[in-house]
Amino acid sequence: MVAPATVRGIDQAPTSHPKLLAWVREIAELTTPDRVVWADGSDEEWRRLTDELVEAGTLIRLNPEKKPNSFYARTDPTDVARVEERTYICSVDEADAGPTNNWMAPAEMKRTMTELYRGCMRGRTMYVIPFCMGPVEAEQPMFGVEITDSPYVVASMRIMTRMGAKILEAMGDDADFVHALHSIGAPLAPGQQDVSWPCNETKYISHFPETREIWSYGSGYGGNSLLGKKCYSLRIASVMGRDEGWLAEHMLILKITSPEGRVYHIAGAFPSACGKTNLAMLEPTIPGWKVETIGDDIAWMRFGPDGRLYAVNPEYGLFGVAPGTDWKTNANAMRTLDRGNSIFTNVALTDDGDIWWEGMGEPPAHLVDWKGNDWTPESDDLSSHANSRFCTPITQCPILAEDYYDPNGVPIDAILFGGRRRDTIPLVTEARDWVHGVYLGATLSSETTAAASGAVGVVRRDPMAMLPFIGYNAGDYFRHWIEMGKGTDGDESKLPRVYYVNWFRKDAEGSFLWPGFGENSRVLKWIVERIEGRADAVETPIGMVPAADALDVEGLDMTSEDIRIALKVDVNEWRDELPLVTEWFEKFGDKLPGVLWAELDALRARLDAEAQ
């Protein structure tokens, strides 16, 4: 074994934090890199890293006139998405992982992965990345340190997190931090030629909730390697929230201002590729309304001193699905990307050094596709992978709300749950109360997408859009949501109202009934007017839906019949849904809160009464 003192840079740490120094030394001794570098987050470091990555063939520098200071990466074709089947929650007690997670005993997983890590950084540089999720000025800053052998990860973490020397300084000598260890698992023998996207066919993304550790091996893809994102901000943070009385959620946060100048904040949980980023950056189509962005993917929510639920976005960047993002669907995202300073992965490359993906208008006559092959409009395959990504600073978003920077967050007035369903689910439904809202979230369902590897188009339950991200037993997670509703000392008026939306309902011919995108502002308007007590709703067995004339559809190319079908609660479709929900709830055994069974029974009774 190589003694740690022989690793270049190991004794040049810019910190005296004893726990951090001991951990870095331990990992260097285990993984035997050629040298250790502490990431400082500087512009000079970004230039050096991106130059090295271009020279290695991992990145291609884009046309600076089109995308200044931006780069393009192609991954190995086997390393393109989160790998849920290789993602583990290694709680001490298997019951704490629950039926929705893969589990392995922590000691066994650490034995297995320690052997994988042994010598895995040979021939490479080990980078130490101090980072903070959320504002470092927060009352309780949420620090992490990622160790990685991937310079692509270092460059991406600079976009996605607050990181570097200023974070290390803020940590001082004794701050707690989440230990996040990552390796691509591709050691280099002396003289061995590297590949442009090194990775390993053996992959593990393991979380140790009790010790707040993340160990990732074998994948360079963002969701598996940018450990501040899903791994820390959702899986580990959800456990922290359970223990400390707050929520870590897969939610956008937006600020909406009415024509009268009244301000509201809405959080929204949607499974991947269901329009979350598009909604977060909405351009309202109705006069006088204004939307600003606070976050597009993750919300941490805590009660404030006034008893209301406040949300912060812990991220510093946007890691969005590229296909389907265009000037029609999300002009603000396109404006953000045009400002540069971004990394694009697995999209297509134009002949003039720009990027392209499906949805961006007429395809060029020639592209180089995400696999590096020539592509023309006659090609059989898509030019860009369905889960291709852009990674860009959120501070470049032209409609970023100033409140984004507030370490105390913003008070949430409404929570949306939404999935992709072609039938059954109306355009918008208001929950009767908090517990009913938890029921709606717990039974959220969507047709699967390409954001995770596996079958596409299958309806699966995705509770609170958190199925792949709950770091503990989902039954306990539902209970935690219910308990959070008691945090206002009995004053439920301080809790956010809960809504279930579905932009994707289709008519008998298979066409979308609702135009979506900017027109979704019309649904937000109805929600705001409900909060203000000004909009009418009709009580149905599943909750409150807009009255026929309550939704502002002026100027829309929709018939009254289209609107009726979009809002319809079909009793037979809902009765068909009941056994599916029953089967879902049974997965959780005695961990499922009894009040959710009671909600299901009450729904069944209301449907039966309606059918008579």
From Swiss-Prot:
Pathway: Carbohydrate biosynthesis; gluconeogenesis. Its EC number is 4.1.1.32. Binds 1 Mn(2+) ion per subunit. It is found in: Cytoplasm. It catalyses: oxaloacetate + GTP = phosphoenolpyruvate + GDP + CO2. Belongs to the phosphoenolpyruvate carboxykinase [GTP] family. This is Phosphoenolpyruvate carboxykinase [GTP]. The gene is pckG.
